Amino acid sequence: MESRLVWNDRYSVGVNIIDKEHKKLFRILNKLFEFGDLETKRPWVCQETVKYFKDHAIRHFQDEEEYMASIRHIGLKMHRRIHKNFRDTTLPALEKEMEDKNYSEESVNHFLGVCAGWLIGHTLIEDQAIVSGEEIKQWENLLPEEEQAVMGQAIVNQLHTMFRLETKMISNCYGGEKFGDGIYYRLVYSTREKKRWEFILVLEERLIINTIGSVLDMKSKAIDVLVMNAARYTSRQFVEYIKSFFPALAEADVKDEQLLTYEQFEKVFEKHSPQYSLLFDTGEGYFAYCMATIDELPDKESGNSIMTENAMAKVEKYLAQNREKKAAAENRKKVLIVDDSNFMLTLMKDLLKNDYEVQTATSGLSAIRSIALGRPDLVLLDYEMPVCKGDQILEMIRADADFADISVVFLTGKADKESVKKVLEFKPDGYLSKALEPEAIKREIDRFFERKK
């Protein structure tokens, strides 16, 4: 195994008993990374090392909780809950899986990925809070605008604490636009009173590689199952940290965990209007945070859930699908369709999706954001857009030096000579009448790219 956990002095919290155990847990997991390659010794060596890790983790929990109680730390109850879940649920499930599979490389990798992710989150999120001196202020009385700003700043601060990222919030109304090669991670929580929330983290792959990957000292520039599992559990603890700001979520438990494709994410995003939808540029990749209340739990039979016994296979399948999609998209042109009509967007997307990488936007703001996040080769722009007209959007595109050379073709519902003349005054790269048959529109777009060769 190429990966290993790398200790950094900034992980220290300044409490000797806690720092000492953290370093020991890092060393134990690194032993498992080494032993995983010893085929002949794997079962008994891994079994003993896992037992050693478990014993030290449980002892560490006790020491940590005693220390927090001694200083009357406000986060003790939350810490106990996180410790209990890992001790009583996560570890036993991982142990059983390894035993059932006779400590196969796959099962050991799953154990390592989950424990590494948990340890990264535990060290960089939860335990840093013990000595930070910052009291979590719950946000129940803030106005919506204040909540958005405070939430954004809390995320910026946390990403800096964890990975020293100089993060900027670039939008407080992220519209679900695609950026780079993304991982779409969804957690669903529920209380005994059946109140439900969903959290979706959208992480650009290079962000995972440059953060989680650096802690694991990974050599590859592609995400594998081990790194994905580490990212999952780090993300879960990140969400637990944010969740702690909301009194209503104090007793909420995870009911489902999913890895979504972009298409699945789009459907979920459209169905549940988020209370928070924030977009960040971390300097190492884009990151989006979305939170919404939902009426019902997702259907676990949908195939998205990874809270199953075959979680490893689900994660591997998800990553394989991502690789296939990435390979298929490499040589395809990107087309951004901008229209306020969902009917028109669906029609155009269905028309073009087999030959082009298609993105959609319903407003000028969303269009500009989509262009900034993933530069298209062609923009099909509705000329009769409400609020911000098509000509105004074209003017915004042309005004930005980075976007000025992007081809823009107007879509117009008016085909009379006077209307066409008015459209052409704004010097688009062309125009298409919506009155044309779909096949004719497709032919015109194909010809447009043929002429560009």
Language-model segments: what does each one mean?
Residues 434:
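A Lys-centered signature of the CheY-like receiver
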Residues 362-378:
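Acidic, metal-coordinating helix/loop segments flanking the phosphotransfer/catalytic sites
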Residues 331-342, 348, 379:
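Conserved acidic segment of CheY-like receiver
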Residues 385:
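Receiver (REC) domain active-site loop signature in two-component systems and cognate sites
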Residues 342-359, 373:
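Two-component/phosphorelay signaling modules centered on CheY-like receiver
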